[in-house]
Amino acid sequence: MGSAQLPLQTKGIFHSLPTFSPDVKALTAIVTGANGISGFHTMRVLLESPKRWEKIWAVSRRPPPEEMMALLPEDARQRVEHVACDFLSAPEDIAKQLKDKGVTADAIFFYSYAQPRPEPGAPVWSNAEELLDTNCERST
């Protein structure tokens, strides 16, 4: 199917999203950093398509706060399951946590990152290079 049949769309803060064929159904997604701004909004967009995205695994150290989950309709909340996972742990420990919960996925949306402490008195993003180095090192 070409782009004429599946045009791009905008959903909230997300632009140029593809439109997917309605034939694709019952997918499962992992959203890491699900209690952050980008992770939570990605989860909201996925949950707007209940036939396509049957289950969302919200993977983060803490579950999304109740105030955030209250923004979702009840039927959407029923399709979200939190998995407590610290991505600073050893890869074997992360794998065990996911496996023990029975997590499987058709797609992964990765929004987790480690924020190094800035120098005292410096703005939070003043150590952008250290932020990049820390997170690139964790993902290799």
For the regions a protein language model found, what residue spans apply to each?
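Universal eukaryotic N-terminal targeting presequences
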Residues: 1-2
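N-terminal Rossmann NAD(P)H-binding glycine-rich loop of SDR-like oxidoreductase domains
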Residues: 5-52
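SDR active-site strand-loop-helix element
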Residues: 32, 59, 109-113
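Conserved beta-strand positions in the Rossmann-like core of class I SAM-dependent methyltransferases
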Residues: 54-57
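N-terminal Rossmann-fold cofactor-binding loop
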Residues: 59-63, 87
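NAD(P)H-binding glycine-rich loop region in Rossmannoid oxidoreductase-like domains
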Residues: 68, 74-135
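Conserved internal alpha-helix within the Rossmann fold of NAD(P)-dependent oxidoreductases
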Residues: 139-140
